[in-house]
């Protein structure tokens, strides 16, 4: 039976920046419109965290029962390592997704009821990433889904629930955050190219191959860097977003130098940290820019 620490590891807490950063970015965009509502931001954060934990457990369950996780590096796999039964991991996934759905329902009803449909699509996307008979994560569409759900959907959704409108500042943040979120998955799938290929999990990294996947990762980081300068058109204070550059460069180091396997594990951590620092810095800059 898995210990509490193993259940926590199975939730993959290092992926939580993917949940937190879009909400921070969207709230900063709402603050730019003089419309930040902090209790709505907290509700959005609850939705995002619950969904990310839910999708991580769902991936553990789905990959585990398929045998995809039998020869993995990285965080603990509860089902693949036979530390927990598939049913218990599935229950954890469904519980997390249900809590996210409940928080999302409350947020939508208090903001814009049509967002319920968006939430339903998000939950379906979380499950179908590796679940179902034809998971899109096994067909090379995982990166696109991460970009959409953790970029435009999460950032602009957060901005809209607070401001009831979106603008180009929110869109720029959405694209940058989506690119950074996508880069985390690209790094993960770069590490897993050998095992994914053996398991017939045809991720985008498997399709592109090692060299082009490394180029894609660096290109996604560059997108966020360019958009930092674009956001300076709103307020010069957005230059503070460049505080994340050293973290991004550190993350990119092992990718540029051709390292693989376990040597890429720190890349996921550093990329997620860079994304969170960037989102906090730019959101703070936008809020301060409206006060100054």
Swiss-Prot record:
| Pfam entry (one) | UbiA
Q: How does activity depend on pH?
A: Optimum pH is 8.5.
Q: Name one GO cellular component term.
A: plasma membrane
Q: Where's it found, cell-wise? A: Cell membrane
Q: What happens when the gene is disrupted?
A: Essential, it cannot be deleted.
The annotated pathway is:
Quinol/quinone metabolism; menaquinone biosynthesis; menaquinol from 1,4-dihydroxy-2-naphthoate: step 1/2
Under catalytic activity, the entry for this protein gives: an all-trans-polyprenyl diphosphate + 1,4-dihydroxy-2-naphthoate + H(+) = a 2-demethylmenaquinol + CO2 + diphosphate
Protein name per the record: 1,4-dihydroxy-2-naphthoate octaprenyltransferase
Which gene is the coding source of this polypeptide chain? menA
């Amino acid at each position: 039976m898995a210990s509490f620490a193993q259940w926590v590891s199975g939730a993959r807490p290092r992926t939580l920046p993917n949940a937190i950063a879009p909400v921070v970015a969207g709230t900063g965009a709402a603050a730019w419109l003089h419309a930040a509502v902090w209790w709505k931001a907290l509700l959005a954060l609850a939705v995002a965290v619950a969904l990310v934990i839910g999708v991580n457990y769902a991936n553990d369950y789905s990959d585990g029962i398929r045998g995809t996780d039998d020869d993995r590096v990285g965080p603990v796999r509860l089902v693949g390592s036979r530390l927990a039964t598939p049913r218990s991991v599935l229950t954890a996934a469904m519980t997390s997704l249900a809590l996210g759905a409940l928080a999302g329902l409350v947020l939508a009803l208090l903001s814009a009821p049509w967002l319920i449909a968006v939430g339903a699509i998000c939950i379906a996307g979380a499950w179908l990433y590796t679940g179902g008979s034809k998971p899109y994560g096994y067909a090379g569409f995982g990166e696109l889904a991460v970009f959409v759900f953790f970029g435009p959907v999460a950032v602009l959704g957060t901005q809209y629930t607070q401001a009831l409108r979106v603008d180009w500042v929110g869109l720029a943040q959405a694209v940058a955050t989506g690119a950074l979120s996508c880069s985390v998955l690209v790094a993960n799938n770069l590490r897993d190219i050998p095992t994914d290929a053996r398991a017939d999990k045809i991720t985008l990294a498997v399709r592109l191959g090692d060299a082009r996947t490394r180029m894609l990762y660096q290109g996604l980081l560059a997108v966020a860097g360019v958009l930092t300068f674009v956001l300076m058109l709103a307020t010069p204070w957005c230059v503070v977003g460049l505080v994340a550059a050293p973290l991004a460069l550190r993350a990119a180091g092992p990718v540029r130098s051709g390292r693989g396997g376990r040597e890429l594990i720190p890349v996921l951590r550093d990329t997620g940290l860079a994304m969170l620092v960037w989102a906090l810095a730019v959101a703070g800059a936008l809020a301060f820019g409206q006060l100054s």
